[in-house]
Amino acid sequence: MATKPTEPVTILSLRKLSLGTAEPQVKEPKTFTVEDAVETIGFGRFHIALFLIMGSTGVVEAMEIMLIAVVSPVIRCEWQLENWQVALVTTMVFFGYMVFSILFGLLADRYGRWKILLISFLWGAYFSLLTSFAPSYIWFVFLRTMVGCGVSGHSQGLIIKTEFLPTKYRGYMLPLSQVFWLAGSLLIIGLASVIIPTIGWRWLIRVASIPGIILIVAFKFIPESARFNVSTGNTRAALATLERVAKMNRSVMPEGKLVEPVLEKRGRFADLLDAKYLRTTLQIWVIWLGISFAYYGVILASAELLERDLVCGSKSDSAVVVTGGDSGESQSPCYCHMFAPSDYRTMIISTIGEIALNPLNILGINFLGRRLSLSITMGCTALFFLLLNICTSSAGLIGFLFMLRALVAANFNTVYIYTAEVYPTTMRALGMGTSGSLCRIGAMVAPFISQVLMSASILGALCLFSSVCVVCAISAFTLPIETKGRALQQIK
């Protein structure tokens, strides 16, 4: 039987064999995430429009919150209110804010940031206008509480900004949003100095509602967050939004197909207390509570010091005491001391302080990091609260208030950025909402310290503010996660 001749095995024949049997590699299609798209598209005209429109939510929020500080002397006299009654107005505003911060955060993670932002502005504008017709103190408190409920949803504007901004621009653009809060604060103080002495506080509230109404119309130019759409599985809407951003920025989209992460349940409160985020969440809550306590404490203390002339602990002799009733049993003093033009000037100067440290704040959070920057500014805030107790001239008081406003504003800037960056998209709005809610507990307590305790003991009130700031500084320094230069997380 004849056999087929075999070819000798050589290196060349083995190489041919290996080349002949190699299976062709299947080329996988290119894909990209929302994060890739945001970074590729870069910063441009869309982000400028986003910054102006979403930043203006800070103007409206500042006007609604600061309004209480400038109308307090007027309603104190009109309805003959005691200290605790004046403080209760601010407390109830923040009570409404606290309750609805959680609700709006849950709804925003489920149904979208844009929808909740629009609803909150419609709500706030409606009840703000109704406040101007309040027939009594009780109605005034109730309606301002409803305004607080609406204002609590304004933080969704910050989330939308954060989710559209490229990583390297977040640390610069988000602190600049403080300009809008400053503008709102200055605007309401300026309007109050003109409107209250002429046509009254009710017209001040009506005029203050106008910016919010205008902004509602402007919202149609801003789309829903692409990150939110992708996280809910709506990649088509997310892709359309990203293409619109790229076109407006005259940029290009990354090559490939937009992919979505594994879908998770959204807006679960339990996620905030998951082992991965438990310590971060608890420390953030402490910091938010303390920062809000200090911030609104400074604002209300400034108004109280000016209204009652409590510099160096002496009450003004010029306060008019109004007693309710005809009998001697009714001893309910109401200090009718309206703000003079000089008082409005002092408030304006101290308010401008909110932007004084902005350049240093931007450098700090981008070079030192969010944690260290926040711990330094909180420590300085504690120091200046104590310095405020020093007997000094009017110029000295203005200087201390100026620095305090600068520091507390820097604190808010940093904690807003950190909170928006540390949580993933699936729970970011809820994280902001719950933090904002805890924050309002501090704001609810602040009026009773600034407007009630301060009347009895300035040193006691200032030491309390300072101690809380020290606790927050330690908490900020020991936060477990640093978000400087870190990409936004899409899923948990």
Curated annotation (Swiss-Prot):
The gene is SVOPL. It is found in: Membrane. The chain crosses the membrane at residues 48-68, 86-106, 121-141, 179-199, 203-223, 281-301, 348-368, 383-403, 429-449, 458-478. Belongs to the major facilitator superfamily. It comes from Homo sapiens (Human). This is Putative transporter SVOPL. One of its GO terms (molecular function) is transmembrane transporter activity. Its main location: membrane. Keywords: Membrane, Transmembrane, Transmembrane helix, Transport. It is a multi-pass membrane protein. Gene3D superfamilies: MFS general substrate transporter like domains. GO terms for cellular component: membrane.
